[in-house]
Amino acid sequence: MADQDRVEILSDRELGRTLVRLATQVLEQVDDTRRLMLLGIPTRGVELSRVLARELERMCGHPIAQGSIDPTFHRDDLERIGTRLAQTTTLPCNLEDRQVLLVDDVIFTGRTVRAAMEALHGWGRAQRVMLLVMVDRGHRELPIQPDFCGRTVPSRRSETIELRLRDVDGEEGVFLKRPIPPK
C-alpha cells in the first residue's frame, strides 16, 4: 500500500516526456549548443542536469558541458533552514561566453536560485544565465522565475515536492508529500 501522505504528480513515463519537452525548449532558445553549460544545483538538480545533458546530447549529437554549482555559502537563510554540508562546485570549463543553464528540481521561495546566481558570479561572467526547474510550486519570496518549467504545482507551505530519479532513488517520478496529521 502506498504512503497516504505521498501523491504522484508525474509518473516515470510522464517525467520522461517532460524531460524531452524541456530539452526541446532549451534547444529552441540556445544559439549554439556547443557553448551551452548545464549546472545543477544540489542536491537533485545535479542529477537532473546529468539526465537532461544526456537527452540534449542525444538530440544535438555532441557532448554538452555539465557540472554543478553549490550555493550553500551564499544563502541568506542559513539560520532558518540550518547549515548543510557544502557540495563541491564542478565547472567543466570557463564560464566566459557560455550560455549557462542552472538546473534545479523544485523552485519554491527563489532563495536557492538567488544564492546559486551569486555563487556563479564568483566564477566569471557568463554570456547568458537561464533557469530550468522540473516543478514550480509557487510561494516566491524573491522575483525569480524559471525560463523553462516542467510543471507548475500549487502547494501549501507545509507540503514538499520530491523529484525521484532512478539512478539515485531506484524509482522515477515527482511526488507531493503532505504532512501526516497527528493522531
Mark where each language-model region is.
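PRPP-associated nucleotide enzymes
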Residues: 1-183
